[in-house]
Every structure is written in C-alpha cells, then in structure tokens.
C-alpha cells in the first residue's frame, strides 16, 4: 500500500511494468535515489531497480551490491537502469531503509554514468 512520498534511501517494492526492450521489468525492490525535496515537490522518484541477476551491470561496474549491507533485501542495485516513477500514481510497499553508504555508492555510480 502506498502512503506518503518516499525518501531518498527507501527501498520499495513496486511494479516497473510496462517496459520495452532491455528495460528491467516486473515487480521488484527499487532504491530511491532522488532528493527528498524533489520527491515531495514533484511526486516523482528517481529509482534504481534491485535484482539477483544483472550480469551486464556487474561486468560494467554499474551496480552496487547489497551483500554485507545488513539489509533484508538481497541482490544488486542496477544504477544503469534508473528511471523516474510517479509515486502518486503507482502502488508500492516500503520494505526498509538502505544504509547511507549504499545510497552514496549508488549515487556515485549514477554520476559516473552521467559524466
């Protein structure tokens, strides 16, 4: 159930469908990367999907592992598959808060992609 606007570092479960081509699909955990002020003002969230696979992202270094992070969510954060979602239009469930070190690593990976 969706309640309120999520914050940076929240791990949510939601459906990423519809998708096209190589975009990651289905219902899965995502990590919220956008700043709280942006989230609240727009109702939009920049999220990175979390998966157990992600071979290409692992090989290219565009992911952050949750292994050893102390989260109940397992897998890797796909920083090369970020997308904007409308938090007011999608149904989601809050799972947990990611450690700040994981969020910082994910933001660094996104910056590397954009620079």
Could you say what each language-model-derived stretch is?
Residues 1-115:
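Conserved functional hotspots at enzyme active or ligand-binding sites that engage polyanionic ligands
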């Amino acid at each position: 159930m969706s309640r309120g606007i999520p914050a940076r570092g929240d791990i949510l479960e939601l459906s990423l469908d519809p998708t096209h081509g190589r975009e990651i699909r289905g219902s899965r955990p995502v990590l919220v990367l956008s700043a709280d002020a942006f989230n609240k003002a727009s109702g939009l969230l920049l999220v990175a999907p979390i998966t157990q696979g992600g071979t290409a992202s692992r090989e290219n270094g565009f992911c952050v592992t949750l292994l050893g992070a102390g989260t109940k969510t397992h897998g890797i954060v796909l920083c090369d598959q970020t997308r904007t979602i409308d938090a007011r239009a999608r149904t989601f469930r809050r799972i947990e808060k990611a450690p700040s070190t994981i969020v910082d690593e994910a933001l660094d990976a996104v910056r590397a992609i954009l620079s």
